[in-house]
Amino acid sequence: MAVCISFINFKGGVGKTASTVNIAACLAAYEHKRVLVVDLDPQCNSSLWLMQPQAWREHVGKGRRSVYQLFRDHINGTHVFDFDEAVVRGVPRREFPLIASLDLLPASVELLKIEDQIYQNKYGQFFSYLYKSLKPHLSEYDYVFFDCPPNLYAVTKNALFASEYCVVPYVPDFLSLSGFQVLAEQVDAFAKRISGYVTGRKPVSIGALLVSHYRAVGNVFAQAINEMEMQLNKFKAGELVAAEAEILQPYIRYCVAVAESTDEHLPVVLHKVNSIGAQDYFQLAKAFDKHFQSLT
């Protein structure tokens, strides 16, 4: 059964999508894991990182073969969404799959319309739509990664309900430190709220943090990471995060090749395998797998 993990942060520009895509690619390509990336952000960044724009537009159409249709079915009581039709197998693709065991359930811009529609049903279990639709397919994968939008609205709550853990990518600075406390409190409050609806598994908790855009210049970044470690230990003692939560290493160093790889619609390990970004994500994926396998 898949380990389901939400990549989440209220802040943008912290490497959330980069971490989702590149860790997924490394796990699938080098650790022989079966990985599904579920793009839940209406910006569709994971989808467009792993698919050519024209291929993505043709695939999702008006959202029918995307996660948008999954939510619409639950809202309207229809049965249009078909997992096997919606999922793109073996992404990225050229004439053939480049990573055979990496799949994508793409987003579409129509997701912008869905929040208000979901909240019309907020007195029901609106947070369970995603899990109910994916549950029959979880045995096909070792990992399911949810690339969440930078908020804690209905779609993100669906991801949290479907997840055992969430991972918080962040840039080590003061704003990330202050924002992490709010995020940890909100995730913990939601986990307590849904605990009565989760059967046979634990409610979601923060299981790890990832450092991105790291620069070993001076001691500013090192000091910020040290402060985050102290806050993380405080939250573990207060049971706001998982007792085993840690800041995974290596830290992802700032690397132009990671940004360039988005233009090529490739994970950095396929774009420039010898870059420091590819090396960091390769090692981080190993640490990531070891960490989460020890928790399950």
Model-derived features: positions:
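P-loop NTP-binding core
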Residues: 1-296
